[in-house]
């Protein structure tokens, strides 16, 4: 069996941001987040870790397929991988802003930006490798749910007087 280290690295890379934000997220979920008015259709807290691990793994492998089939970081893959990197950076920014700083409004802006950038990345990736585009579909569906939750949280949790305005 031959291990394709590029595939392994690309698959692990997006998970790193999730792993790094886990302590901050857990602390906030056990405290501040529990005080928020949340929609009844919000998935249970224990679902988020496994779902994000699957989504990060799928998008990471999708990026490998694009890199492999699109000629590396130049040529056909350049736009798709640039958009992928941009959406990954936006994704990683959300947890510290939302869970760390408790900025619901800024979290919503980031979530909407992420949805648009990830959608553009998914389309660009599908032009290079159709399977890569399909691997991004569950992520886009989850981001759609996340955006509706973010909007609900923003609408139903006004800034607190003891906190800076969002």
Please report, for each region that a protein language model flagged, where it lies by residue.
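N-terminal signal-anchor transmembrane alpha helix
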Residues: 1-24
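Terminal transmembrane helical module of multi-pass membrane proteins
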Residues: 126-166
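Helical transmembrane-bundle signal
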Residues: 15-19, 56-62, 88-91, 117-121, ...
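Membrane-interface helix caps and helix-loop-helix hairpins in membrane proteins
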Residues: 96-105, 126-130
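Helix-adjacent hinge/juxtasegments
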Residues: 57, 61-95, 99
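Membrane-interface loop-to-helix entry segments
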Residues: 45-57, 102-114
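Cytosolic, membrane-interface loops and tails of multi-pass inner-membrane proteins
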Residues: 25-44, 160-166
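Hydrophobic alpha-helical segments of small multi-pass membrane proteins
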Residues: 81-94, 107-121, 136-144
């Amino acid at each position: 069996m031959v291990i394709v280290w590029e595939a392994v690295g690309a698959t692990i890379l997006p998970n790193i941001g999730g792993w790094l934000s886990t302590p901050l997220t857990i602390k906030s979920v056990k405290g501040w987040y529990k005080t928020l008015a949340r929609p009844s259709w919000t998935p249970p807290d224990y679902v988020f870790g496994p779902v994000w691990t699957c989504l990060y793994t799928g998008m990471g492998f999708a990026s490998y397929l694009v890199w492999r089939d699109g000629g590396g970081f130049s040529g056909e893959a350049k736009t798709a991988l640039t958009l992928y990197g941009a959406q990954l950076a936006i994704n990683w920014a959300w947890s510290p802003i939302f869970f760390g700083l408790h900025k619901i409004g800024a979290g919503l802006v980031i979530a909407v930006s992420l949805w648009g950038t990830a959608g553009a990345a998914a389309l660009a990736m599908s032009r290079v490798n159709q399977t890569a585009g399909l691997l991004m579909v569950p992520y886009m569906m989850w981001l759609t749910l996340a955006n509706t939750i973010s909007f609900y949280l923003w609408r139903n949790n006004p800034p607190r007087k003891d906190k800076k305005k969002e």
